């Protein structure tokens, strides 16, 4: 198996689920280093937030941080960096129904499309569950990084 970098597939924001979605709810941080009740915690996946009718991708995201609207873009902020009055996204859903969309099916490989169609019945996989295929892909990715002069950081 030779590794091929997956392509990013942006959501189709013309779909009804996105066009009909409300704007994300923004609530001011009550004080420094504190998020309001019901704040949205970011994940490992790309996340979009609907603000003033437009979907914004949170860049430089990280898990378990807080999305803050700065008037132009979504910034992903660690709790220790929240400032009193920051406009923080609140909401607990990830399906666009609260103006928050977690794009967990965004990396597309040709062989995955074939597998997805063939094994559609195997959908009982959580985000935190690893499978043998995951380890095989990790091995191929590490080989690819070594061959192309990449830089691997193990955390």
Segments from the language model and where they lie:
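Metallocofactor- and cofactor-centric catalytic cores in central/energy metabolism, strongly enriched
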Residues: 1-155
